């Protein structure tokens, strides 16, 4: 029988899981929400992969939490895919993050027009999104169907990503739109470029009281960042709407059927923290769809132009299959790590597509980290 890295080096993660209330790594990192398969397909004989995307507003503690979780496993058992900081600062463009914050500041000070700011922001967001989108495309051929047996073995590999492509292709553009430095047309152009959602896409969003969030962000030192409280409020709002949108879609919501329930073109007020899938289906007015009832997108009869409606169809199609989890960051770094480990027990694995997929994926992740990680 072929041997895969996760089968050889699972003991470190097993021990960590047991010490935190899991019987073994099988329960710590094996999905619960799976259905029994009636017959075994060739794909189901392949090892499984767990992909976890740690996302949400900047400054919550995502990177620290992720690094602590990764430290629980062996090098071949769990692989971390960091933010592509070197690409943003050097390879893709010069100091992209600093350029974004400087442009917003100049707009806020009246030094440049909204149109000039939008040109810079749109270009910068292309740079921010490129590493995520291309990595997703390279990974896609190795991702098979979601594991279909409650008796599936522990994953041969766990990949922990610092953000999903929707961060750069949806959430941050939408927040910049709320800040007045990007057009709604540009936001929907990015939406049209979001890659198809792969099976087993587990996204972890965060909850943290705003005052605590501001305090953490003020203490953080990232190259090029400014403490922009208006932007922090905007991105918190967008991620809250994102969580609501996934719940809305998975609860059977249809933006086309409910569009008439939106009134006016006002931006939704500040929302509460992202919520789990529990509770009633959100109103369309509490989802991302409400952002796009903008005059620039509407025909004279008040309906969306078809090209923009098609973009919202893409948005719905991309978000509906996602498995969203909420992590409470209002605790110590170790507490956040343990809570994240607990969340993984309910996440969805996928089979890989070839016997060589696991080492290929490992190599892809390490190449990404080596070439574009912050240490470069």
Swiss-Prot record:
Residues 19-32 have a biased composition (Basic residues). Substrate binds at residues 101, 125, 222. Used in molecular biology as a selectable marker to identify transfected eukaryotic cells. Used in cancer suicide gene therapy to selectively kill transformed cells. GO terms for biological process: DNA biosynthetic process; TMP biosynthetic process. Residues 33-44 have a biased composition (Basic and acidic residues). Keywords: ATP-binding, DNA synthesis, Early protein, Kinase, Nucleotide-binding, Transferase. It catalyses: thymidine + ATP = dTMP + ADP + H(+). Its EC number is 2.7.1.21. Catalyzes the transfer of the gamma-phospho group of ATP to thymidine to generate dTMP in the salvage pathway of pyrimidine synthesis. The dTMP serves as a substrate for DNA polymerase during viral DNA replication. Allows the virus to be reactivated and to grow in non-proliferative cells lacking a high concentration of phosphorylated nucleic acid precursors. Homodimer. This is Thymidine kinase.
């Amino acid at each position: 029988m072929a041997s895969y890295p996760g089968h050889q080096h699972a003991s470190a993660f097993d021990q960590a899981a047991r010490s935190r209330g899991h019987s073994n790594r099988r329960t710590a990192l094996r999905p619960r929400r799976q259905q029994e398969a009636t017959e075994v397909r060739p794909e189901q004989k392949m090892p499984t992969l767990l992909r976890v995307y740690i996302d949400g507003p900047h400054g919550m503690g995502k990177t620290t939490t992720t690094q602590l979780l990764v430290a629980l496993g062996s090098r071949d058992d769990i692989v971390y895919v960091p933010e592509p900081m070197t690409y943003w600062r050097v390879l893709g463009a010069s100091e992209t993050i600093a350029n974004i914050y400087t442009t917003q500041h100049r707009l806020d000070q009246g030094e440049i027009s909204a149109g000039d700011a939008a040109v810079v922001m749109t270009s910068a967001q292309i740079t921010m999104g490129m590493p995520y989108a291309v990595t997703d495309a390279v990974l896609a051929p190795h991702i098979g169907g979601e594991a279909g047996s409650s008796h599936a073995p522990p994953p041969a590999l766990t990949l922990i990503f610092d953000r999903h492509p929707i961060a750069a292709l949806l959430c941050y553009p939408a927040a910049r739109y709320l800040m007045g430095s990007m057009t709604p047309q540009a936001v929907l152009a990015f939406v049209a470029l979001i890659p198809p959602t792969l099976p087993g896409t587990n996204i972890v969003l965060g909850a943290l009281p705003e005052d605590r969030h501001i305090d953490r962000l003020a203490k953080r030192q990232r190259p090029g960042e400014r403490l922009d409280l208006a932007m922090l409020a905007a991105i918190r709002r967008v991620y809250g709407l994102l969580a609501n949108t996934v719940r809305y879609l998975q609860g059977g919501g249809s933006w086309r059927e409910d569009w008439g329930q939106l009134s006016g073109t006002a931006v939704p007020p500040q929302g509460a923290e992202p919520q789990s899938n529990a509770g009633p289906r959100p109103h369309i007015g509490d989802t991302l769809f409400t952002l796009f009832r903008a005059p620039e997108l509407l025909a004279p009869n008040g309906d969306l132009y078809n090209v923009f409606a098609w973009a919202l169809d893409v948005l719905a199609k991309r978000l509906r299959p996602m498995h969203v989890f909420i992590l409470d960051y209002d605790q110590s770094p170790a507490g956040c790590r343990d809570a994240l480990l607990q969340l993984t027990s309910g996440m969805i694995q996928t089979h890989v597509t070839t016997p060589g997929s696991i080492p290929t994926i490992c190599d892809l992740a390490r190449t990404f980290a080596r070439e574009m990680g912050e240490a470069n």
